[in-house]
Amino acid sequence: LAATANARLPRAFWEWQAVIKANESGSYPYTPATNLLFGLDVALEMLLAEGMANVVARHARFGRAARAAADAWGLETYCQNPSAHSAALTAVAVPAGHDADALRALILDRFNMSLGTGLGPLKGKLFRIGHLGYFNELMLMGTLAGVEMGLQLAGIPHEAGGVTAAMQTIV
């Protein structure tokens, strides 16, 4: 707050003095993002109902399943430290000479399924599969099936059986 008191640059979002003044009367100086607050309330209810330990375990299980699929496809997962794979997403590299963004576009067009892109220097070299939040086993299997079908349609060299390998890790 001290930094904003002396700041001379124009600002709106970080104008804390207006927020503090309005809060004295129980108000807020701008239109609050009430829909975000309602969404947060529901998300917290869901989190508490499942239990934090169960949520963390589910995300880790889904990460293992996604990596099992990539391994079965013969594709490399991108993680500098293999013991520190993310429970939130799995980054999968496509073989040299193939474009991950073209694969993503094909999958989006054919199956209406969105995959994450590689960021920075990895753009076009890998795609990212998210497996966190409101996500269950069937959603993951559908995602992996969409990827496997997309790999086939795009002519990207891979082995079949990624979905089966993933199922074996979570059934």
Regions found by a protein language model. Name each.
Residues 36-39, 43, 55-58, 62-66, ...:
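General structural feature for long, well-ordered alpha-helical segments within catalytic domains
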